Regions:
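Short, surface-exposed polybasic-aromatic patches that bind anionic ligands, especially phosphate groups
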Residues: 1-447
Length: 447
């Protein structure tokens, strides 16, 4: 039977069977010796001496301490960033590179302790990391335009630009209505029927928008029918019609439009031309040739710079329910994007904040990956001079007081990416990190 089981042959070969028995016995003995050796090593191996470490954590309690010397003592800290600041305050070398060593709690039971360091805790902060310089602030709505939530995204996924003719209509705080097109927001005069007709806004219900989104969108001029001084008076010499009329001249395959003013002509966008025609005496465009334009005086009286240049198409909430302000270093003022879903990388999952209020004005979720250090920037601010922030993986922003504090935390300042301060200030904020706090002791750690 043994031969059949071992060799697959019912005919026994006694010497071969004995060899196999010896090999099995030797393997068993070696295995037992290995187990015994491991047990002996576990008993005899000395536990790490906390005095020789920089930061220690109790194996059972999870309590963390920075190790101070002269004399040897333990300084209770909230987490590793706080420990690094304490080590820097103690002028310990390589504080920014310090990591925690796990030691048995019983080895710490008789160790001298100080009061806790006056450094706040910071959950899920990784000072060595940074966040890719691509940010977005997004509002999401339901098919009827009702607000669903607001999300701040760091390391936003690239998305194709929206069509220049596409626009969204927003209902902002304070009963304001905004037309967002061409990367900017324009306030709409709800009582100006001509504006609503020219931009085909009649009957369209604006989608709800938070102050967080509206505040970061670049603002263009308000959309209201321009007031033309002396409308209806005779046009200046050499110009047809009356003040307030609109002239049209063919240029290549397109047309240019000119408002007749008391001082001469002003070129205007098509939308402004349409508004002026509605309000003019002639009620129609007056075609002119190059000879009239060549002899005319041109002025810049009407405040129409920055108006939409061409026809627009308002995108409905059920088509593209997400509206975002987007930012990257090449566009310091930011831009506008809208689509069917948030601009997230595949697999990314936003963290829902405790302050989330859904249809309210607060930020509801944040997606910044593992978080990290960033340098705040904004329009008009030179690169690399803004304040440092630490953004946690759960979406909380912490200020960093100065360069020595950043170095103590382990921030690699040369690798830190810029981030828009406008977006950072929308995040829930924690108490700033400051190396000066690490030298003070308190009975209760500040929150």
């Amino acid at each position: 039977m043994e031969a059949a089981l071992v060799r697959g042959d019912p005919v026994p070969l006694h010497e071969q069977i004995r060899s196999q028995r010896r090999a099995a016995l030797a393997g068993l003995v070696l295995g037992l010796l290995g187990l015994c050796g491991a047990a002996v090593w576990a008993v005899l191996e000395p536990s790490p001496d906390w005095r020789h470490e920089s930061v220690v954590v109790g194996a059972t309690s999870g309590a963390m301490y920075a190790v101070a010397h002269d004399p040897d003592r333990l300084v209770p800290v909230a987490d590793l960033p706080a420990a690094r600041l304490v080590l820097a305050a103690l002028r310990t070398d390589r504080s920014g590179a310090a990591t925690a060593t796990v030691v048995p709690d019983e080895t710490l039971s008789t160790a001298p302790r100080t009061p806790a360091a006056a450094v706040p805790g910071a959950v899920a902060v990784t000072p060595e990391s940074t966040i890719r310089a691509s940010w977005a602030v997004c509002d999401s709505v339901d098919p009827e335009g009702g607000l669903v939530g607001t999300t701040v995204i760091g390391d936003a996924a690239p998305r194709p630009p929206v069509d220049a003719a596409d626009a969204v209509l927003l209902a902002g705080p304070g009963d304001t209505t905004w037309l967002v097109t061409g990367g900017v927001r324009h306030r709409v005069d709800d009582g100006d029927g001509a504006v609503r007709a020219v931009f085909r806004l009649a009957g369209r219900l604006p989608r709800a928008a938070t102050g967080a989104l509206v505040s970061v969108l670049p603002e263009g001029p308000p959309l209201a029918t321009p007031v033309v001084p002396d409308r209806g008076d005779p046009a200046p010499p050499g110009l047809p019609g009356r003040v307030g009329d609109v002239l049209a001249a063919g240029v290549g395959d397109g047309q240019q439009y000119f408002a007749v003013l008391d001082g001469g002509l002003q070129e205007v966008p098509r939308a402004v031309a349409d508004l002026l025609v509605v309000a003019s005496v002639a009620r129609e465009l007056r075609p002119v040739g190059a000879d009239v334009l060549g002899a005319a005086t041109f002025v810049d009286t009407l405040p129409v710079a920055g108006w939409p240049e061409g026809p627009i198409r308002v995108v409905e909430p059920d088509q593209e329910p997400v509206t975002c302000w987007t930012w990257d270093p090449d566009r310091p003022e930011g831009g506008v994007w809208f689509g069917r879903e948030l601009p997230l990388d595949a697999g990314a999952s936003p963290v829902t904040l405790a302050q989330a209020d859904g249809t309210g004005q607060k930020v509801d979720a944040v997606a910044v990956g593992v978080g990290g250090a960033v340098r705040a920037t904004g329009p008009g601010r030179a690169a690399g001079v803004g304040p440092l922030w630490l953004v946690s993986a759960v979406g909380v922003g912490y200020g960093v007081a100065d360069g020595p504090t950043a170095e103590a935390l382990g921030v690699v300042t040369g690798a830190v990416q810029p981030a828009p301060e406008a977006a950072l200030r929308l995040l829930p904020s924690g108490r700033p990190f400051d190396l000066a706090d690490a030298g003070r002791a308190v009975d209760a750690t500040p929150g």
